[in-house]
C-alpha cells in the first residue's frame, strides 16, 4: 500500500471511527436521558419512588420538553468536555509531552544518549522531508516506550522515555523513531489527538458521578440516597461508554501499529533494529509501563502498549516480532530477549563514544564540509520514472537516511551547536534571506531593525558570514531544522516574522525559487501550526483545473529559459493529469503571487489526485533532460504544501556545475 492509498484508507477509517464514537455517545446520552427523565418524573410528585417503565414513558410523552432538555444537556456536556480537551491540546505534540512530565531535548545537549536521540530524529526529518519535530524525553519514565503527537507535521513532537534512551542501541532507537515518523507521515497523530478529546468527553460523565457521590455521601435522607444511586449510575455509564470508546480505539490502533512497524523497516532496511527494541521490552514484564497519571489518555499513541486483550492498542509482541522475522517461535521470546541484552553492551558503548566524539567536534572549526567554498548550483542524473518518484512520497528509504546523515554532518558547526531558542532560530532564518548585493542588503537590514530592533539586526549580522558560506544544497535542509525553535515564538512574534520575511523577499523587486520555497515552507509550518489546519481531501482534478494550470505553467517556465520548450514541457506534464480538457499555457508576470494561493487550494485534492498531480509535475520537470536544484526544491515544496512529504531526490554531495548529466529514460 503506497502513501496515497494509506491516506485514503486513513480518511475512510477516520470517518468510520467518528461514526462509531458518535454512536457510542448517542447510546450513552439516550440512557442518561432516560435516567434523568425518570428522576424528573419522581420529583414531579406524580409517581411513587418505584417507577415502572410505562410510567416513565407516559411522563416522557406528556413532557417532551423535559426529555429534549436532558438530551441536549448531556450532549452539550460531552461535546464541551471534548472541545475543552482539544483546546488544551491545540499547541500540538509538545503539550501532550509536557502534560506527561516531559523535558524538551535541546540541540546543544551534552548528554550523549540524548544527543544520539536528537541526531536520529534530525536524520529522519531530513530523509523524510518532514519539518523537524520537537524532541522530548520523559525523564521520570523508566519503561521503554515512545510516542508521536500533534495535529499535523507542523506541530508534531516525538517523546521517548528515559528508559528507552538508556536501554536501546542506535539501530534499535532508529527502528522506534522510524515507527513514530510513520505515524507522522500517515496522519495517525491527528486521529489520535482527536480520540483523546472524544474519550475525555465520555470520561467526564463518570467524573460528574464521582463528584455527586462526594457531595451526597454524608446525607441519610431519601433524597441523598436517590442522588447516590443516580451518581453511581453516572459513574457506571461514563466508564461503560469510555470502555466502548477504548475498544473502538484499540481496534483502529492495532492496524495503525502494524503499518507503522512495516514502514519503519522499509525506512531503515534493518528489521533487527525494531526487533531488538521489541525484544528489549518483551524481556522484562511491564517494561513498557508508563507511570504518569494521564497514561490512559495516550495509550493508543505509544510504541508499546501496557493494556491487554480487548483494550490492547497494539498487536502482541509475538505477532510484531514474527512479522519482522517469519522464523520466530513464540516460545523462544525469553531466550531471544536475554541474548539481545548480552550482545548489546559493547555495541552500545562504541555507539555512544561516536556520539560523544560528535559533541566534541561541535566546539572545533569545520575543516571540510559542504559549506566550504561558494554556494553552487547543480544538475543531476535522475532515472525519470514519474510513478516511481510519486511513490517515494511518504516512503523514505535507507539511501535517504544515509543522505540525511551526510547533510546533518555537513551543516556548519555554528548551526549545529546553537540551541533551539526562538531568537537564534529566527536569526538563522532571516540570514538566509539577506542579499549579497550591498545596496539591497542595507535596505533589508533597515527593514529588520524597524521590525525587530537594533539588537536583532546585530545578531543577524553576526551569523551572515556563516550563512553566506552555506552550500545551496544545504539551505532548505538547514531551514527545516529551525522549526522547533520558530514554534516557540508567540503568536504576535510569528505574525511579525512572516510579514518581515515577505518584505525581505521583495526588497530587490524580484522573487527567486529559493525565496519562494523558503517563504512558503515557513508560512506552511507556522500558520498551520497556529491553526492546526489539515486538508480535507475532497476535490478532484477537474474541479481544480485552473489551479493545476497555474502550477504547471510556473514549473515549466522556471525550468526552461526558452518559451517554446517551456510550452512543450507544460503540455507534456499537464496532459498526463488532465488528458481531456486543460487551460492553454499562460504565465502571469507575477508568478509567485499566482502560485501561492493556487497551492493552498490544491491542498484539498483527494489523495489519488495528488499522486497524479505529482507524476505530471515530474514529467514537466524532466522534459529538458535535467533536474536542477531549484526544480528539486520547488517540487519538494509543492509536495510539502500538498501534505505529501517527498524525500531528497538529488545526491547529497554537490555535483560540479561544469558536469551535465542526462536523465535516464
Where are the language model's segments positioned?
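Hydrophobic or amphipathic, alpha-helical segments that drive membrane association/targeting
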Residues: 1-149, 166, 186, 191-250, ...
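Cytosolic-facing loops and C-terminal tails of multi-pass membrane proteins
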Residues: 4-8, 225-250, 269-503, 515-619, ...
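Active-site recognition of the HExxH zinc-binding catalytic motif
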Residues: 121, 160, 175-183, 187, ...
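Envelope-exposed proteins and targeting segments
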Residues: 133, 154-156, 297-299
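Membrane-embedded segments
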Residues: 141, 158, 163, 169-175, ...
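Short alpha-helix carrying the canonical HExxH Zn2+-binding catalytic motif
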Residues: 169-185, 498, 502-507
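DG-centered beta-turn motif at the end of beta-strands
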Residues: 179-180, 260, 316, 504-509, ...
